[in-house]
Regions:
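Secretory/endomembrane lumenal or extracellular ectodomains immediately following the signal peptide
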Residues: 1, 15-17, 48, 52-134
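Structural motif
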Residues: 1-2, 30-36, 132-138
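Conserved small/polar residues in nucleotide/adenosyl-binding loops
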Residues: 168-169
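The feature marks the first
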Residues: 1-25, 32, 45
């Protein structure tokens, strides 16, 4: 897990020059290709698609380069179950969010813009957190690292630090 922090932070910052070596170190330490793909895919929910896509391209380039050098990196596992759809996805995402936060999430912002709450529940906590080839502790560690590099994300950083504390103490 220690290699997830620099990879996540550098990818969120868009620091490709330093991301390559961090990815190399992670692979050398046994982090699987699919674990890194999960972290860098999850990145888009926090830092946007451009940074996620650029980081994934950097990983792909590195894996191909290493393959050319005869290094066979562990691909790791894929998700073991299909992601729910429709109402089942909303239900799963809401349950995941509630478990991570420690209580149901609501409030004035979600009353004002209910679509954002639905997107969080169905997509972030549904589609992404239902993928079981990266554990929740690693996902939250990655999220905290990502948010810590982003200006103006203090409220979200605090929220995810609280979620991490709940995960690591339960």
């Amino acid at each position: 897990q220690q290699h997830i922090v620099p990879v996540s932070a550098l990818a969120a910052a868009g620091d490709m020059a330093r991301l390559g070596p961090a990815l190399q170190e992670a692979l050398n330490a046994g982090v699987t290709v699919n674990e890194l793909k999960e972290v860098l895919t999850q990145l888009y929910a926090y830092a946007g698609f451009p940074r996620s896509l650029n980081a994934l391209a950097e990983l792909m380039k590195l894996v191909e380069q290493r393959r050319g050098q005869g290094i066979d990196d562990d691909e790791g596992r894929l998700p073991s179950r299909p992601i729910p759809t429709g109402d089942a996805l909303l239900k799963a995402g809401t349950a995941n969010q509630t478990r991570l936060v420690g209580a149901p999430v609501g409030g004035a912002l979600f009353d004002f813009a209910p679509a954002v709450g639905t997107y969080l529940q169905t997509h972030l906590f549904g589609d992404i957190f239902e993928r079981d080839n990266l554990d929740w502790k690693s996902r939250e560690l990655a999220t905290v690292a990502m948010l810590s590099t982003m200006a103006g994300a203090q409220a979200q950083l605090q929220s995810h630090m609280n979620m991490s504390c709940l995960l690591y103490t339960s």
